[in-house]
């Protein structure tokens, strides 16, 4: 599969991310087959979000991953998104930190390769978001950060305030 460089951290990933939004109703065996099929095609970049299936998409993926010793964490690039609650956006530091803890628990992994903010939240100061990113990076829970559906000015402000680099995935 063709690869592309993701963001400025110069990590090569498949040009196509495997979307996991509609997988919440799969059985563990079906999910295991899904993961293996993707990996066999060279698609090791899995895209999740804490709201997909109310978290069930991540849970089923995590169960299938954890129960199969042939699946190695280092062979996958796991991305998830946070910041959307039922009926509102929430990028408060508290919500971001709680979301990541839930994501890691559901995916049954110690870290995310990439965390994206799903949508901007105009009610939260960018400094609060940047502080959450710094905590997650320093704790080793998240290796890289990015945004989805943000304007260039919003990205620049977060980059200015955070200790780590933030980027928006390229759209193809």
Model-based region annotation:
Residues 164-172:
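Conserved small/polar residues in nucleotide/adenosyl-binding loops
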